[in-house]
């Protein structure tokens, strides 16, 4: 599969508008909360001690005990999964570690701008909040916590005393380092359940009509620069197209070099099929879309889906054993159970360098 990068002009404009709004927010924070705000135009950070009391209360609850046990169990499992997905991506030439950049299309997959930005912020918020809960559970304190932005992306952070964490026994260290990823996995599964629930509600009440959109055309094909971007595909050779798999069904009855008639919202197009892997290929990148009868329901459905994807992606990706990611810190604590600190540090550093090089190689598949 091709993973050509693509971003539309409208998405570029939307990203710039969001970036401008975030800048305005941080300018006001810099004016009224100067001592808590660091603002550098493309980067900003705001520290606060609000909500820390809530973290403390939760740290004394049964939920924190459950989260603590779950983190200890999931930590090593997520490290294993993170490494597995990296090697799986390399072996299959799939960019499993491609960055979640809003508005970017990786082949047929487009990350919606608003939903992606919201999902990244929520995933980062609950991730860091969970770290804070287990820090307090171990009777340690936080210097502060807050949120930041880098370009159009927003996230959250907590500032524990790392030296105090290193004084804890290795089991407690593993719990603290793994808990952010653990809560992301839990949240991701909850959002997945809500997503499928929304699909069920939409289907039983017939709240949406399916259709297929042509996002853009690919170079070295006869469709390139012939069919406009963001065109609705109605039919191929008279066969109605409502779902993506129907396109493949029609193409199975054709051969490379044959002409097909595409009926679209931009008019009729007689396109010659090219040969790709000995199969007929139109040269269009399509996306499944729905015409929703209730305003806003499509946004909610999309948001729930991307909340699932981003949370699970952050939960697994952050546990790749590369220092100073949580996975690297967790791996170091695990190694120190069996080895001395110097040996653990050397192994962790060596592993980090190797895995970082492999991740960069994996990401290169999108170029």
Language-model features: locations:
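Hydrophobic transmembrane alpha-helices and their immediate loop junctions
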Residues: 1-367
């Amino acid at each position: 599969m091709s993973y050509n990068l693509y971003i539309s002009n409208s998405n570029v404009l939307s990203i710039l508008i969001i970036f401008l709004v975030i800048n305005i927010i941080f300018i006001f924070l810099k004016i009224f909360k100067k001592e808590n705000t660091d603002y550098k135009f493309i980067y900003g950070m705001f520290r606060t001690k609000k909500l820390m009391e809530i973290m403390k209360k939760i740290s004394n609850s049964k939920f924190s005990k459950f989260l603590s046990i779950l983190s200890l169990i999931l930590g090593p499992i997520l490290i294993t999964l993170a490494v597995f997905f990296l090697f799986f991506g390399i072996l299959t030439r799939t960019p499993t570690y491609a960055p979640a950049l809003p508005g970017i299309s990786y082949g047929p997959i487009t990350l919606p701008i608003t939903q992606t930005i919201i999902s990244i912020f929520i995933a980062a918020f609950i991730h860091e909040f969970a770290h804070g809960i287990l820090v307090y559970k171990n009777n340690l304190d936080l210097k502060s916590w807050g949120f930041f932005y880098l370009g159009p992306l927003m996230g959250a952070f907590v500032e524990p005393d790392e030296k105090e964490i290193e004084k804890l026994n290795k089991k407690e260290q593993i719990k603290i380092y793994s808990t952010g990823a653990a809560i992301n996995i839990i949240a991701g599964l909850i959002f997945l359940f809500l997503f499928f629930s929304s699909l069920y509600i939409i289907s039983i009440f017939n709240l949406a009509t399916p259709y297929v959109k042509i996002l853009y055309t690919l170079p070295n094909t006869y469709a390139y620069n012939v069919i406009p971007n963001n065109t609705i595909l109605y039919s191929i050779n008279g066969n109605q197209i409502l779902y993506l798999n129907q396109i493949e069904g029609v193409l199975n009855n054709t051969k490379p070099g044959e002409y097909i008639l595409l009926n679209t919202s931009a008019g009729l197009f007689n396109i010659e099929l090219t040969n790709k892997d000995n199969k007929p290929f139109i040269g269009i990148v399509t996306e499944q879309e729905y015409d929703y009868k209730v305003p806003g329901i499509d946004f909610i459905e999309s948001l729930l889906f991307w909340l699932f994807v981003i949370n699970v992606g952050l939960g697994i990706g952050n546990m790749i054993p590369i220092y100073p990611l949580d996975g690297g810190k967790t791996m170091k604590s695990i190694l120190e159970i069996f080895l001395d600190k110097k040996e653990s540090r050397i192994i962790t550093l060596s592993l980090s360098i190797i895995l970082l090089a492999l991740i960069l190689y994996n990401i290169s598949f999108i170029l």
